[in-house]
């Protein structure tokens, strides 16, 4: 699907369809008023007859409106004008895309980007429209024999901006939106892939392909179990002992800033391609969804793709910590004591608290890069789902400015996060009689104690932890990976690169 931006009046548009908004109760948006005027009140007469109230989600497709050059006009209900916020704006765009796709409108000029969304500029509205359109049209059908496609799918969308001065920011918004959407799609595709296909070796192959596609700025190194043993990554290795699939850590390095002094931002993704729970095995109900336990690694991969596509002038390293947690004769056990790469020892009380064991060694490994900041992304705890539900990602950090940056980026991108504390009081829950720490701290504050565990391996740099257990995928009829928090991290890196969307 193609996107472009232009500046023009609605009466001059020769298009298959023009898209304009209508507010409650039966109030035309400024652009719709212009079309109504040139059509001698045709549109307002329809509204007076009760054809459209303007409630969110309502649509009315008009054909051959008098004096209008376009073949059709699509009226979209936007709700009450003063209540149009970011969430409702994206829902309006989603409804628009679905309606155009279902009605065979192969191209359209969209004036919805001229609607007023409080605190948001045209760059934001165009970029969010692109990202929402791509999200709406996403489907995972690679493994289906019969693929359903619309007879006349939407192929081209033109966004209208009020003045020619805003064309440049509109074009940049499309460029950024497409790159972020492609990163989200890549993350969703990886997340949705079944575990008999997507194992640690598959993650490594995707990382290598990324380096091949962007070879001027990206290199990938894959570290196998033999090298992990030499490095002393015993906690990481222990988690994968029960699986016949080798644990592999893929390190993707992007160099956009040639300066010797430019320190990288490191992203670490938990990549448990299937988590049975190990010896502390999970209940069978819903266990199929444990293929999504690698969505942290999938998100990091998607972000690295975005960075390479936009050639951001910063250095970023993405680590995909690939592994599989299975029961078996070689599997690690409750009661085992593991010596981590940092030298600290961990008593295993539950083999289903495995993600932190993988991550702790990776967080030690990345010290060698002397990072500007390290952000790990993990479907880490069910406790975070209880705390924040399925709408907001949990954030913990040992550095207030980094936490504030990430929270700001989450609001900008509409991919929200909420900060949880990392107090010393919670560290006490990790005490062990037999090792430096236990790998679980009991039920109270489970998401926080998991973050506290990781914080013990991050004392040499600024670090943040994103717990995406509640936001990485959906269950039920709409089951599938969400691609979060690709948008949040993309915005964070765009801000670091000087593209904050404030033009």
From Swiss-Prot:
**Which SUPFAM superfamilies does this UniProt record tie to the protein?**
Macro domain-like, Zn-dependent exopeptidases
| Principal place of residence | cytoplasm
Q: Write down the InterPro entries for this protein, in alphabetical order.
A: Leucine_aapep/pepB, Macro_dom-like, Peptidase_M17_C, Peptidase_M17_leu_NH2_pept, Peptidase_M17_N
**One MF term in GO for this entry?**
metalloaminopeptidase activity
- How is the cofactor bound, in the record's words? Binds 2 manganese ions per subunit.
Which catalysed reactions does the entry list for this protein? Release of an N-terminal amino acid, Xaa-|-Yaa-, in which Xaa is preferably Leu, but may be other amino acids including Pro although not Arg or Lys, and Yaa may be Pro. Amino acid amides and methyl esters are also readily hydrolyzed, but rates on arylamides are exceedingly low; Release of an N-terminal amino acid, preferentially leucine, but not glutamic or aspartic acids
* One GO CC annotation: cytoplasm
The active site is formed by 282, 356
Q: Which PROSITE patterns match?
A: CYTOSOL_AP
From the UniProt record, list the coiled-coil ranges: none
**Needed cofactors:** Mn(2+)
Identify the CDD domains for this entry: Peptidase_M17
Q: Which UniProt keywords apply?
A: Aminopeptidase, Cytoplasm, Hydrolase, Manganese, Metal-binding, Protease
Q: Which domain of life is it from?
A: Bacteria
Provide the binding site for Mn(2+) 1.
275, 352, 354
The answer to keyword Secreted applying to this record is no
Annotated positions binding Mn(2+) 2: 270, 275, 293, 354
One GO term under biological process is: proteolysis
The family annotation for this protein states: Belongs to the peptidase M17 family.
Q: What does this protein do?
A: Presumably involved in the processing and regular turnover of intracellular proteins. Catalyzes the removal of unsubstituted N-terminal amino acids from various peptides.
Q: What is the name of the protein in this document?
A: Probable cytosol aminopeptidase
Organism of provenance: Salmonella arizonae (strain ATCC BAA-731 / CDC346-86 / RSK2980)
